[in-house]
Amino acid sequence: MEPEMQAAEEGPSAPRIYKQRGPYSVLKTFPSRRPALAKRYDRPSLLELSPARPSPLPPPPPPPPFASLAAVPISSSEPPPFPTQPSYPAGSGRAPAAAAASSSSPSCTPAAPPGHPRTPAPPPPPPPPLAAPAASSSSSFAAVVRYGPGPATGACSSGAGSDGASLELSAESRMILDAFAQQCSRVLSLLNCGGKLLDSNHSQSMISCVKQEGSSYNERQDQCHIVKGVQSQTSDNIDIEMQYMQRKQQTSAFLRVFTDSLQNYLLSGSFPTPNTSSASEYGHLADVDPLSASPVHTLGGWTSPATSESHGHPSSSTLPEEEEEEEEEGYCPRCQELEQEVISLQQENEELRRKLESIPVPCQTVLDYLKTVLLHHNQLLPQPAEQPTEGSKQLLNNYPVYITSKQWDEAVNSSKKDGRRLLRYLIRFVFTTDELKYSCGLGKRKRSVQSGETGPERRPLDPVKVTCLREFIRMHCTSNPDWWMPSEEQINKVFSDAVGHARQGRAVGTFLHNGGSFYEGMDHQASQDEVFSKTQDGSGD
């Protein structure tokens, strides 16, 4: 009796604990590698969007805490209630990013290991009510951000119901969303906090408060009669600072979530993602380049001679040989763990795809509101619809951008499998010299007002063409692994170089000499006058 009671008090023995917490106890070992590889390669690793929406799916899960906070009208005098933290599976091993987005602590709580419950972070103090003008604008902004059930979407449901048969948006609607996304990104770049949800000053002030409270009891007792008069002033200053920081964070959070949703819409073609769940529930992907995670688009027939299969479906050269599949004895546990991880990631992709397909198309009411804002700030220029000429082909199926077969052959043959050079040629073919010359590039930099400057106002390049070229370069280099894919900074540099050369009176493609960038690959002994003379007589092409 006594040994049994002692064993019950001590809990499970060491072998049992190891069996329960072993890293490979949850993973099911495969009888052979063939079914595992079939499961791994039969499913796409990227989100593939079908042109037609499938049958109605079950309703999506409730929105994360940040979405509910964004939907609460800020103009109300009562502080918005803090939503309870949603329950997550214990074995996931990932801390929910929604808690990190809505928490005001400077550092997020680390993710607990599998099998251990994660201690929920204390709820932050409710944000103070804003002033009347800011509250009205923010509440209207929240009504645009929110795409859930509510009075703000009454017209949306009716508009979406009338367009239920056709999910494709018109060119004007796409132009409105593209222009609004570009203006939101410009506002974000000009904010002092840089679009971050937390600020360093805020965290330092919180740490200083904690350090002040952490002093010993004797010191506080000695300083009590001295600091009593100062504490009231410091508390008022801290309250003012907290209010300012929370207002700043709310504005930045609204703009960032809305900009991310519009950018995701642009990347997903005809299926928009204007909801906050993608920015808050999956916040660990917020710092990743959105173009690198864009869904698969068809290239509209533009392929190079050595074309491999699409990303996520490896070619025959990357598949293992039959002899390797027969060797099941050397299949290590780490490989089994990786196979299980791949399958779990594919299941996550399928869940994301189902959520993406369940999002409604933006209704006409939202589009009219965005168009009104753009027209009020004189930022919407209706672009003439580009008519495809005979022999021209479309770069991407979702964008009205066309080039001829001769131009495509010239660009591919002269690019030397470099994505930057290909982008330079495409800019030369898609934009005219005047469009580049009288534009402010991508509109990302803060322009200083120069007095006495004459001529038309400089506006950003057509966002539809810019987005099309960006995505086409990414998709082309992804589909052709032998091509060199440029980074986001290098793509922006190519656009700015093209605008700079157009302003200097040169042809658009004259900087396509022998190097990858502006004067790269040229003889460094040659002066700029010689380079300019070469570009004038056309020898620089």
UniProtKB/Swiss-Prot annotation:
Which is one Pfam family of this protein? BEN
Q: Which PROSITE patterns match?
A: BEN (PS51457)
User: Where are the compositionally biased (Acidic residues) regions?
Assistant: 320-330
Compositional bias annotation for Polar residues: 304-319
According to the record, the residues making up region (Disordered) are: 1-135, 297-330
- Compositional bias ranges of the Pro residues kind: 53-66, 111-131
Q: Which residues form the BEN domain?
A: 398-506
Q: What is the protein name stated in its UniProt record?
A: BEN domain-containing protein 4
The species is Mus musculus
